[in-house]
């Protein structure tokens, strides 16, 4: 299955997908340190090569990936949801990015969606 990894972080979910036999075709991650880890894991062979979208997820267009992606995965920011966070929930600035994940899922229309997040959700 071809995966589009949103909020990819340092690639733990991508590695899990690789173990399941998924092929990541693109990752979206704004954090520079996380992107550096993704590149390092590609360079050392832990992860297969894939392009990394480094701009804000609000600028990512999922439509070109329609028909090319079987699963959209990701864990949108949970700081506003978790018990250690602000308590503003899905309306919070960071956790509100769930709506971008929803938008991209609608653009891509994958067969499957895999979301990881706080149990407080």
Where do the model's predicted regions map?
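Conserved active-site and SAM-binding loop architecture
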Residues: 1-121
